[in-house]
Every structure is written in structure tokens, then in C-alpha cells.
């Protein structure tokens, strides 16, 4: 019972050794994934494993971490096999939790180098007024420069991205030379970065669709579980509302930084709701509630930030 009452902030015994190698323990991974599972998710998962987990074990499940611990006690998950956990997360359409099903420790948060650089260099553009000038001068008309808005490139079908098909025929010597020059970019040339945006619409809950439609009369418990599992998987796949993947090209660091902050604080999600959750989609799903999931790869943002930061450093050079 003491193990069941363990808090998420406490350190598991095996984690003290694995921390030295930059790894999470299996139970720490259960803590991370389990805290993001809602009570509705846990009820759906328990419903799928009603024939595998006995009544006593099922009565101890209070949250997502308890369910994952029950899977471990049933031999369905260990340090070398996360297949069952990954498959269950896909069935309940919690694709946002798939990156957390790993023992590799995530990198610690470091200070924002962009903010630090902008703060240090902003003093160069502040010129205090001379004390000998008592009257304010009329403002000089500034030359307006059109901002470099990001370019969005969305796939037209499947996972195919917006790429030009190369022309057929024999390549000339001049084109080969141009291609060689394009491989090695000019160090003074302005760099751009691509940020991949994934948007997915899905139902808020699937219990009403699963109840009454998942049934098996097979005698063997394992066969009965697989049949129920396949039926639930087919139903959830039929309720897939689809997704879209976009590549957004940035050439200015300020726009990239503002885009990332809007993604973190939820402003991007609220703005995309009016674009993707249309009246036709609401009419297609009927009275069921739907939600929008937005994902931006953090590694793309960090790599893009380094490229655009290099542009600022080149501009600061004399």
C-alpha cells in the first residue's frame, strides 16, 4: 500500500542509479505519462482491459499511473517493451503523449539566448537626446520596410510536402555547377528556417461510440480480449477526423520567437480553431464535442532559432 500512495515528486529507488546515465526509470516514465492521462482516458483503457485485469487490480486504479503500473504487474510492459503502451495511446488518440514514452531524459531548460542577445544589443539603437537641445525636433519620416512574413507550405495529399518535381532530361554542365554552388551556402547569405506545424481535430470522448459496439463471445480470455481490441480499434479509426501538416518558413527571428510564444501560451490554438473547426465539420460530427490538437516540434524551433540568430550576429558585424 505504501507503493500505491507514492507521490509523483518522490524518487523511485532505481532512479538514483539511472539519473547518472541521463535516463528515466520505468516508474518515472509512468509518472510523466500518467499525469497527462485524464479520468476519461483511464476509464476507456480500463474498459479495453476488463478481461485482463481482475476486479481487485482494477479497483486499485485511480489514475493513469496506477493503470500503467497494473500493466507492468500483468507483464504487458517493461524497460525493453513499450509496444502495448504506445498502441493504447494511439487507440485513444493521445498522440501528444507518444514522445514521452521513452526512458531517455529530456534536456533541461536553458536560458533563452535570443532574449539575452536582443537585450544586450538593443542598447545600440537607443540614442539619448542631447542636453543642449532645449526644443524637441520634429520626427523624421522613417522609411517603411515591408516585414518578412512567414511563408506557409502545406501538403496537398498525404505526407507529400510542397516540393518541386525535378525536370526530366539530361542535366547540363552549367546546371551541375549551379547545384554545386547551392550545396555550400554563402556565409554572408541570410538564413531561413522551416518549422513544422501539425494540426489534428478529434472527438472529445469515445465512450458512447465504444459502449454497446464492442462485444466478444469467445471462450478463451486472450482471444476475447484481442477481438474486443480489434473492434475498438476499428471504431476509433472510423472516427478519425483527419489532420494536416504545414511547413512554415521564417526569415526573421522576431516572428519565429513570437510564433513560439503564441504556441506555448495557447494563442495559436485559439486562432486555429476558427480556421479548422468550421461549420461543415460541426455539421458532420453532429452533437458530439470536438477539439483541436496543435503540435510544433521543439527541436525545429531550436535549430531555426540558431540559424536566425546567426543572421543577427552577421548584421551586428561592421
Swiss-Prot record:
Q: Which segments constitute the DED domain?
A: 25-103
Q: Which gene encodes it?
A: Dedd
Organism lineage string? Eukaryota, Metazoa, Chordata, Craniata, Vertebrata
Keyword Ligase carried by entry: no
Q: Name one GO biological process term.
A: spermatogenesis
Give UniProt keywords alphabetically: Apoptosis, Cytoplasm, DNA-binding, Nucleus, Repressor, Transcription, Transcription regulation, Ubl conjugation
| Protein name in the entry | Death effector domain-containing protein
**Subunit (UniProt):** Interacts with CASP8, CASP10, KRT8, KRT18, CASP3 and FADD. Homodimerizes and heterodimerizes with DEDD2.
Coiled-coil annotated residue ranges, if any: none
* GO cellular component terms, semicolon-separated: cytoplasm; nucleolus
Instruction: Write out the annotated subcellular location.
Output: Cytoplasm; Nucleus, Nucleolus
Q: Where is this region: Disordered?
A: 128-191
- What InterPro entries does the record point to? DEATH-like_dom_sf (IPR011029), DED_dom (IPR001875), DEDD/DEDD2 (IPR038856), TRADD-like_N (IPR049341)
CDD domains the UniProt entry points to:
DED_DEDD (cd08790)
Please give the Gene Ontology molecular function terms for this protein. DNA binding
Q: Known SMART domains for this protein? A: DED
Q: PTM per UniProt?
A: Exists predominantly in a mono- or diubiquitinated form.
Iron as a keyword of this entry, yes or no, is no
Pfam families the record matches: DED, TRADD-like_N
Protein's job: A scaffold protein that directs CASP3 to certain substrates and facilitates their ordered degradation during apoptosis. May also play a role in mediating CASP3 cleavage of KRT18. Regulates degradation of intermediate filaments during apoptosis. May play a role in the general transcription machinery in the nucleus and might be an important regulator of the activity of GTF3C3. Inhibits DNA transcription in vitro.
- What is the annotated tissue distribution of the protein whose record heads this document? Widely expressed with highest levels in testis. Within the testis, highly expressed in germ cells but not expressed in Sertoli cells.
